[in-house]
Amino acid sequence: MKLAILSRQPDSYSTMRLHLAALDRGHEVDVLDTLRFAIDLAGDGPDMAHRSQPIEDYDAIIPRIGASITYFGTAVVRQFEQMDIYTPNTANGIANSRDKLRAIQIMSRHEIGIPATAFARNRDDVLPAIERVGGAPVVIKLLEGTQGIGVILAPDTRVASAIIETLQSAKQNVLIQAFVEESRGRDVRALVVGDRVVGAMRRTAAGDEFRSNVHRGGTVEAVDLDEEYEATAVRAAQIMGLRVAGVDMLEGTDGPLVMEVNSSPGLEGIEEATGLDIAGEVVDFVDNQVAFPELDVRQRLSVSTGYGVAEMLVREDGLWVGQTIGESGLLDRDISVLTLHRGAQVIPNPRGQRMLEANDRLLCFGRLEEMRDMIPDRRRRRSKVRPLPIDPESGRPVDDEIEV
């Protein structure tokens, strides 16, 4: 395999480990400065140059895109995708994970456990937002940031409001997130490669620091995750569009709460904690997947006029419950079932004899008119807002810690 590692720091631990792991396995590998690419676009196909020279014919890339170059870095990765060169982490996946709000929105939509989170811009909406996540103390986060930078613990509502107002006056967008007391100063990092967790560690903050990042002096220890934590980590990474990711989880009372999905996870801490060859796992996975570059399936399947992809629900009171896919009549209507989603389980390419259960969701390809009456109704919003009392004189929400 001819491999390119995209990195601005060729001497960093993670880049060097990936480089050596590839060489040890007999692969040809180059480390390329992400900012030295130039993207060429023309009607005869996409192309690129690196340091003003045409790039070589690579089989795969491993992107290590830093937060400061997200826009250009994802453009480079996207260009490799358009050239049918395999990448374990797509441009969309990197962009999804880098924006904390977008990542939380995606995970919330797919019902992955997350700390209660709010996003508000208007000053009048800040206090109600703090109340909706459970009240102070709260964690305030900038939308972009790594290694614990831009993460602040506000002990009470007054301080939280002042911090948010200051950051917003500096044109910063912030998230307001519930503080999970039972996981104070510690979290779990699971390193996901493909469809499994290849290593995990618990990070513990130093002293009174509530952020457990290794770069902030935290300590690490290897940890064996139970099935729930492993499944949550893998599902979070895959939903984000990442095949190599570091998934950070808080140990909540009711199970794992995903804080962040990192598209360029550092390898030093987890390799030292576990003694495992994580870099080798990444290279082996890429080698096994190199023949299957990422495809925009929905876009390609929708090219045929009148055909497309849709999700169908097996309703509890519907005729399909207890029937097989073959008995449902879908195949007779020229509708192909691509995947069957049952809770957190995904069954690819289910056969005709597969029995259907209530609340199964079928990802199907077929004629749109045939599928129209089978598409589930839009999910009703489940309001969880706990309104604050209203001051009769000002008409504004009242908080016990704020003078009105």
Can you name each region flagged by the protein language model?
Residues 1, 224-298, 302:
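ATP-dependent carboxylate activation and anion-phosphoryl transfer catalytic cores
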Residues 1-23, 29-31, 40-41, 49-56, ...:
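Active-site nucleotide/adenylate-binding loops and adjacent lid/helix of ATP-dependent enzymes
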Residues 36-57, 67-73:
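Glycine-rich, highly charged phosphate/nucleotide-binding loops
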Residues 67-89, 377-384:
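A short, gly/pro- and small-residue-rich
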Residues 82, 352-354, 371-398, 404:
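Short, compositionally biased
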Residues 151-236, 240:
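Phosphate-binding site of ATP-dependent enzymes
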Residues 293-314, 384-399:
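Long, charged amphipathic helices and adjacent flexible linkers at domain junctions
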Residues 316-378:
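Cytosolic Rossmann-like ligand/nucleotide-binding regulatory domains
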